[in-house]
A protein has these predicted regions:
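Cysteine-nucleophile amide-bond enzymes
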Residues: 1-236
């Protein structure tokens, strides 16, 4: 079971004929795959930013999660982003992020209001400096491998969602705490604003899961609404 590779699928009606078609989870990320390069001016508070760097930690995360991204942050406005890193929750500039990362891509929740963006920023401010969830990250490695069984092709989305949550209950436990790793922090920030991205436990979500919540992709777990692609701030 530990060696199985997963690729989530979904059966959707064809755009023109309405006939059922089988969609596969997409790993495409580069602007050459249909994206566009943007500047930080295009960002709005609450935008979700996914990144990848060339270091060993990033490569390891991408290999384990079978994803082109390894980190997640949230845009606060005023050229600042918030993120959970090893030193804890921190706020830094977009320029600093662009200097450190090889790939930076932004997504937006279509229903996020200005008031909810303020609530997200309030959540961030109240958690700045809090500790990183090292235990959650360590548990992600075996969980990421075990869950691939649930993500085999042709597994129905509801079954896949139930399967992943079941494995998470065993591998991760069901408790909650006030320490976060990067993608968990994003999920909790949105939940605090009354706009949860999913009903699943934020601790089972990795940056790749956030990527697959985008429009036109196949999410591994059930989501409330797809994220809209904003653009790439940097591409490898």
């Amino acid at each position: 079971m530990m060696t199985l590779g997963g690729c989530a699928t979904a059966i959707k009606p064809h755009e023109t004929t309405g006939a059922p078609t089988l969609d596969f989870q997409s790993m495409a990320l580069n602007p050459s795959n249909g994206g566009e390069l943007i500047g930080a001016y295009a960002l709005q508070p609450g935008d979700i930013i996914l990144t990848a760097e060339n270091g060993l930690n990033s490569v390891g995360i991408r290999l384990i999660t079978l994803s082109p991204v390894s980190h997640a942050a949230i845009y606060m406005g005023n050229q600042q982003i918030a993120e959970a890193v090893g030193s804890g929750i921190r706020i830094r500039s977009v320029d600093a992020m662009l200097k450190d990362e090889a790939t930076v891509v932004a997504f937006r929740h279509p229903d996020l209001t200005a008031g909810q963006a303020i609530q997200i920023n309030t959540f961030v401010a109240s958690h700045e400096g809090k500790k990183y969830n090292y235990l959650g990250v360590m548990l992600q490695a075996p969980f990421a491998l075990e869950r691939r069984l649930c993500e085999l092709p042709l597994v129905p989305s509801t079954v896949r969602d139930f399967c992943i949550r079941g494995i998470a209950a065993v591998q991760l436990g069901l408790g909650r705490n006030d320490q976060f790793f990067c993608s968990q922090f994003i999920l909790e920030a949105y939940r605090s604003a009354g706009l949860p991205l999913t009903d699943a436990d934020p601790r089972l979500i990795n940056p790749g899961d956030l990527l697959h919540m985008r429009e036109g992709d196949v999410p591994s777990i059930m989501i409330h609404k797809p994220l809209k692609y904003v653009g790439h701030l940097k591409a490898a």
